[in-house]
Regions:
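Class II aminoacyl-tRNA synthetase catalytic cores and aaRS-like
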Residues: 1-206
Length: 206
């Protein structure tokens, strides 16, 4: 509603032009789709998430994506999402239930603990606003940190975990990419055109 409100008040209409020349109507339907579903749909591979790693790599390469063999399974999939799927999401789309490995600070989804309570709002082929529920269970958070750290256990933020043990109420947050939104609304050709206070040279030229 906020983006629709801004569009109406700034432009006097509810539509903007996408990068491919098509029209995006913020007053229209905003799609909601799970990460696993959109990956399976756009790769035309319903069993993508059960494929062995080498098969994922082969399919990603066939899509024109360079893949480092050292990447984890979830990283390979996310490369496919970011480089071949996200750019095609022109109309407003909430992508939900991302893999838990992508955001270790997010709360696990109660209906699928392999995913997290998160959404990414994609418009015009870009992520405009990521949001998620904060993990406030210290035991679950420690497990995520340990999985992320692997053998580098010293990287775990124990002070943060101790703070969680003292108690944290339910919380969540969202960050809107204002610069990307301004580009979308104004048709700016470069992100530098949206910076309110760009760096400038001193008057003496130094």
């Amino acid at each position: 509603e906020m983006i629709l409100h801004v569009c109406r008040n700034a432009l006097g209409r509810t539509t903007v032009t996408a990068h491919d020349g098509s029209e995006i109507d913020f007053a229209g339907e905003w799609r909601e789709v799970r990460y696993k579903d959109i990956v399976a749909e756009r790769t035309e591979c319903p069993d993508w998430f059960s494929l062995p790693k080498d098969e994922k790599v082969a399919r990603a390469v066939a899509l024109g994506i360079e893949i480092d063999p050292a990447l984890e399974d979830f990283e390979i999939t996310n490369q496919v999402f970011e480089k071949r799927i996200e750019p095609t999401l022109l109309r407003p789309t909430f992508v939900t239930h991302l893999p838990k490995e992508l955001i270790p600070l997010a709360k696990l989804s109660p209906d699928d603990p392999s995913t997290i309570e998160v959404f990414e709002l994609c418009i015009n082929g870009q992520e405009i606003a990521p949001a998620y529920s904060e993990q406030n269970d210290p035991l679950a958070q420690r497990e995520m940190f340990e999985a992320q750290a692997g053998e580098e256990i010293q990287k775990i933020d124990n002070d943060f975990l101790v703070a969680l043990e003292h108690g944290m109420p339910p919380a969540g947050g969202m960050g809107i990419g204002i610069d990307r939104l301004v580009i979308l609304l104004t048709g700016a050709s470069n992100i530098r055109e949206t910076i309110l206070f760009p760096p400038v040279r001193p008057s003496d030229g130094r």
